[in-house]
Amino acid sequence: MPRPRKADRTPARQRPNPLDRDGVTYVDYKDTELLRKFVSDRGKIRSRRVTRVTSQQQRQLARAIKNAREMALLPYGTR
């Protein structure tokens, strides 16, 4: 028999897109302060689901983070 659903469940609150909220139109690889917000403490790029950015912004962020790593502005990762 299926469980009854809770009637008092509230919908998830929509969190704003952090890049749109800050007015960022171009993601620059030299802006390490911005890029660090989208990198985990282990050095991995955070997912869209966690950061709430659009797919186009996620691609721009990934490219900028990879360029910043190549230029030694960001670490590749830690163990």
UniProtKB/Swiss-Prot annotation:
Residues 1-11 have a biased composition (Basic and acidic residues). Pfam families: Ribosomal_S18. One of its GO terms (biological process) is translation. InterPro entries: Ribosomal_bS18 (IPR001648), Ribosomal_bS18_CS (IPR018275), Ribosomal_bS18_sf (IPR036870). GO terms for molecular function: small ribosomal subunit rRNA binding; structural constituent of ribosome. Keywords: Ribonucleoprotein, Ribosomal protein, RNA-binding, rRNA-binding. Residues 1-24 are annotated as: Disordered. Disulfide bonds: none annotated. GO terms for cellular component: cytosolic small ribosomal subunit. Binds as a heterodimer with protein bS6 to the central domain of the 16S rRNA, where it helps stabilize the platform of the 30S subunit. Belongs to the bacterial ribosomal protein bS18 family. Part of the 30S ribosomal subunit. Forms a tight heterodimer with protein bS6. PANTHER family: 30S RIBOSOMAL PROTEIN S18 (PTHR13479), SMALL RIBOSOMAL SUBUNIT PROTEIN BS18M (PTHR13479:SF40). This is Small ribosomal subunit protein bS18B. It comes from Streptomyces coelicolor (strain ATCC BAA-471 / A3(2) / M145). The gene is rpsR2.
